[in-house]
């Protein structure tokens, strides 16, 4: 069965959804614009199958995406597989934002283990009865509903497995303003997740933590360099000894964390050369802090 849910669209999509509903295998649901989590819950309550697969309007699944997830569904020893998640490939357009986003998401999937803590919204399927028994998707989670429901399943003893063979293709994510708004929203959702699900290790954060700490640690490193220069200026003669003595324990302690951050940044896939890329990282870091603090 195919279930289409229209979340109060105003671009003519409702007519198209109702047109498709004439097919015997298609169920169409229209509702007011109350959010993606409520959409998924409406579909879940209408579904009849053993497995409940979800995707989004801004992706195009490969024809075999559900077959590939079903292949990965059998539980191994000690597992109770309740969800399977696949891989989302972000397209690239002729702008820096889409390239950064595409490369970042690709790097996350490259290091993703088979057993994971997140069934991503664009490409996942769930044991329908298990998900319903835990309350399904919470409509109050307007965003990050996939994170919330995944952790609910894991805390109940379930296993989520990842298969790279199930693929959906995401449209390019373009535009700096929209990108920053989404990252701010992501940060706010992570705060909410950590408050509700304490002690749960998340394995799909990727390079966001590097970007998050960019502003404070670069500022801390700059202060350490300024302190070192200040110490140097107190010497009458600049030689090897003065350069060594100016490197006080305070300077070392202040600079050690920024050096660890710099090492992680240089090993990441984040942009490092072009000024525009650096500017995007700075504004991205600010957006994350806004989402956390505001």
PLM features: residue spans?
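Conserved donor NDP-sugar-binding/catalytic core segment of glycosyltransferases
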Residues: 64-96, 171
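Short aromatic/hydrophobic "clamp" motif used to bind/position activated sugar donors
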Residues: 52
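Membrane-embedded multi-pass helical conduit in multi-pass membrane proteins
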Residues: 215-294
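Glycine-rich, basic loop-to-helix element that forms the pyrophosphate-binding segment
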Residues: 31-47, 68, 118
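Acidic donor-binding segment of Leloir-type glycosyltransferases
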Residues: 1-30
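A recurrent flexible, glycine/aromatic-enriched loop bordering the glycosyltransferase active site
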Residues: 90-92, 107-126, 142, 148, ...
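Catalytic donor/gating beta->alpha subdomain of glycosyltransferases that bind UDP-sugars
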Residues: 73, 140-141, 147-202
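Acidic donor-binding/catalytic loop of UDP-sugar-dependent glycosyltransferases
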Residues: 12, 16, 57-72, 151
């Amino acid at each position: 069965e195919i279930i289409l849910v229209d979340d109060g669209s105003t671009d003519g999509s409702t007519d198209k959804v109702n047109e498709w509903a004439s097919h015997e295998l298609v169920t169409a649901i229209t509702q007011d614009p109350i959010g993606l989590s409520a959409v998924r819950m409406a579909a879940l309550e209408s579904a009849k199958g053993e497995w409940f697969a979800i995707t989004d309007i801004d992706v195009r699944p490969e024809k075999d995406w559900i077959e590939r997830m079903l292949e990965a569904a059998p539980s191994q020893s000690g597992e109770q597989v309740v969800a399977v998640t696949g891989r989302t490939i972000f397209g690239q357009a002729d702008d820096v934002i889409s390239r950064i986003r595409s490369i970042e998401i690709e790097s996350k999937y490259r290091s993703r283990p088979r057993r994971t803590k997140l069934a991503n919204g664009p490409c996942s399927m769930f044991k329908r009865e298990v998900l319903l028994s835990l309350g399904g998707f919470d409509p109050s989670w307007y965003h990050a509903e996939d994170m919330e429901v995944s952790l609910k399943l894991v805390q109940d003893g379930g296993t989520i497995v990842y298969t790279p063979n199930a693929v959906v293709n995401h449209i390019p994510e373009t535009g700096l303003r929209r990108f920053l708004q989404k990252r701010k929203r992501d940060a706010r959702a992570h705060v909410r997740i950590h408050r509700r699900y304490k002690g749960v290790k998340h394995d799909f954060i990727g390079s966001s933590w590097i970007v998050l700490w960019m502003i404070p640690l670069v500022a801390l490193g700059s202060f350490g360099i300024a302190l070192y220069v200040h110490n140097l200026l107190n010497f009458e003669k600049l030689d090897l000894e003065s350069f060594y003595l100016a490197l006080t324990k305070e300077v070392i302690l202040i600079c050690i964390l920024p050096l660890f951050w710099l090492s992680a940044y240089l090993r990441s896939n984040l942009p490092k050369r072009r000024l525009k890329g650096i500017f995007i990282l700075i504004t991205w870091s600010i957006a994350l802090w806004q989402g956390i603090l505001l």
